């Protein structure tokens, strides 16, 4: 879908029905899925096979919605989580571990500021908050040998400060680390954080 316009992606991406399947994405409400044997289920639990076995972990409806978001964002993969805070925690905690350091714009949602400044600190991950108007040199000065990522919000909540994504991305990429962008308050096709 990468060559399609945003309007087409909104309508067509994600669910791709085959002949005889519903035109509209069905909502799968089952929490569990049937298999012929416990060996088949065991292979799924052991991650030897791919498939659905428990909706809390994976569900066809969620997968299609995630694929649509991925197509709209121009990404390579996506997953659904229960909240923005869950997404921020998941993204940062899968990159950082105890003893690591991260950098974040200081103009971010209060819950995220608390997550990085208090909760992650209790887990041994230190965060340095940087003014979003800082120069590339000032951002680079905050980088340490154990810095694993840089974080920012496209439009900060509630201050509505606009993040210079390109500036933060330049620093992150120069140092071989990801820039994680919370794009909650922006429209996908306007800010396009994955372009950076």
Feature roles, as predicted:
Residues 188-196:
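Conserved small/polar residues in nucleotide/adenosyl-binding loops
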Residues 37-86, 111-119:
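Conserved N-terminal alpha-helix of the aminotransferase class I/II PLP-enzyme fold
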Residues 94-112, 131:
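Conserved PLP-anchoring active-site segment centered on the Schiff-base-forming lysine
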Residues 21, 69, 87, 102, ...:
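Buried hydrophobic positions in well-ordered alpha/beta secondary-structure cores of metabolic enzymes
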Residues 1-59, 67:
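N-terminal "arm"/small-domain region of PLP-dependent enzymes with the aminotransferase-like
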Residues 132-187:
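Active-site phosphate-binding strand-loop segment of PLP-dependent enzymes
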Residues 119, 123-130:
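A glycine-rich helix N-cap at a beta->alpha junction
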């Amino acid at each position: 879908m990468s060559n399609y316009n945003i309007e087409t992606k909104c309508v067509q991406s994600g669910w791709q029905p085959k002949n005889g399947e519903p035109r509209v994405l069905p909502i799968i409400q089952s929490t569990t899925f049937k298999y012929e044997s416990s060996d088949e289920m065991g292979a799924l639990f052991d991650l030897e096979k791919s498939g659905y076995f428990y909706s809390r972990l994976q569900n066809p409806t969620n997968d299609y919605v995630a694929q649509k978001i991925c197509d709209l964002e121009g990404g390579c993969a996506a997953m659904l989580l229960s909240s923005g805070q869950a997404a921020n925690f998941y993204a940062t905690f899968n990159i950082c571990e105890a003893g690591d350091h991260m950098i974040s714009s200081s103009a971010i949602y209060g819950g995220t500021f608390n997550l990085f400044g208090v909760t992650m600190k209790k887990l041994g991950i230190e965060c340095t908050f940087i003014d979003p108007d800082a120069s590339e040199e000032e951002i680079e000065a905050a980088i340490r040998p154990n810095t694993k990522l840089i974080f920012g919000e496209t439009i900060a909540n509630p201050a509505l400060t606009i993040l210079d994504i390109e500036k933060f991305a330049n620093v992150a990429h120069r140092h071989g680390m990801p820039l994680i962008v919370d794009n909650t308050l922006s429209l996908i096709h306007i800010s396009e954080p994955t372009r950076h």
